[in-house]
From Swiss-Prot:
Keyword entries, A-Z: Ribonucleoprotein, Ribosomal protein
Name this protein carries in UniProt: Large ribosomal subunit protein bL19
SUPFAM superfamilies: Translation proteins SH3-like domain (SSF50104)
Function text: This protein is located at the 30S-50S ribosomal subunit interface and may play a role in the structure and function of the aminoacyl-tRNA binding site.
PANTHER family found in the cross-reference section: LARGE RIBOSOMAL SUBUNIT PROTEIN BL19M (PTHR15680:SF9), RIBOSOMAL PROTEIN L19 (PTHR15680)
HAMAP family with a match to the protein in the record: Ribosomal_bL19 (MF_00402)
Family: Belongs to the bacterial ribosomal protein bL19 family.
Length: 125
């Protein structure tokens, strides 16, 4: 039993070293801009992906967010591992006021029906 506890502590300490400390507080419904490092040819650049957080899964180092945007009339969703070294930055542009943990119903909506009310607070808080 004691060996199991030590193994869990070792795993927790390794994960803590890998986690990013400077991430903003992200909630479902927020409008975010995620900077992703991508490699094209021999060059590396940061590509911005801006959209609404429709789901959050897992915790700790395995935390993921699903971000959805509509591009040229087609819905695009990407799942980001927020503590990944490929993620350069995450900015919260606007806080959304929602009453659900998962916003998958937005997939069925079109145009203005996909809008989410803004929270009264500022995005920095």
């Amino acid at each position: 039993m004691n060996v199991r506890i030590n193994a869990e502590e070792i795993i927790r300490s390794i994960e803590a070293a890998q986690m990013k400390p400077d991430l903003p507080e992200i909630r479902v419904g927020d409008q975010v801009r995620v900077g992703v490092r991508i490699q094209e040819g021999g060059k590396e650049r940061v590509q911005a992906f801006e959209g609404t957080v429709i789901a959050m899964r897992h915790s700790g180092i395995n935390r993921t967010i699903t971000v959805r945007k509509v591009f040229q009339g087609i819905g695009v969703e990407r799942v980001f591992l927020i503590h990944s070294p490929r993620i350069e930055s995450i900015q919260v542009l606007r806080r959304g006021k929602v009453r659900r943990a998962k916003l998958f119903y937005l997939r069925d909506r079109v145009g203005k029906a996909t809008r989410i009310k803004a929270k009264a607070e500022s995005p920095d808080s």
